[in-house]
């Protein structure tokens, strides 16, 4: 399955490059497996590693990854079900939160 992912910049220097990339992933990949796949290929390393990456599919938050504790929101959901249920394309977006508290405040 081909997917396109874009992401937030994490610092001023990171703003200098484009973040939109295409990946080929297994058809049955879950949200947790996607984050594990992207962690070494795409997601930037952050000092102290206590950040949250939220995964969006066209403005709808479908999952999240808490990097310090290695925990996922909706980790077992396959990307293919998200795509087929939405009748939209294979584009996703990763939103960066500099701490779990900032992530929680955004949704409360």
Question: Where would I find each of the regions flagged by the language model?
Answer:
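Extreme N-terminal starter segment of soluble prokaryotic enzymes
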Residues: 1-2
């Amino acid at each position: 399955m081909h997917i396109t992912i874009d992401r937030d910049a994490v610092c001023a220097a990171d703003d200098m490059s484009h973040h939109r990339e295409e990946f080929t992933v297994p058809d049955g990949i879950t949200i947790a497996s996607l984050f594990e796949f992207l962690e070494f290929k795409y997601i930037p390393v952050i000092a102290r590693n206590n950040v949250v990456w939220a995964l969006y599919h066209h403005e709808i938050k479908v999952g999240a990854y808490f990097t310090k504790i290695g925990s996922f929101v909706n980790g077992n959901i396959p990307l293919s079900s998200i795509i087929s249920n939405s009748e939209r394309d294979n584009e996703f977006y990763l939103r960066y939160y500099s701490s779990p508290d900032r992530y929680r405040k955004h949704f409360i």
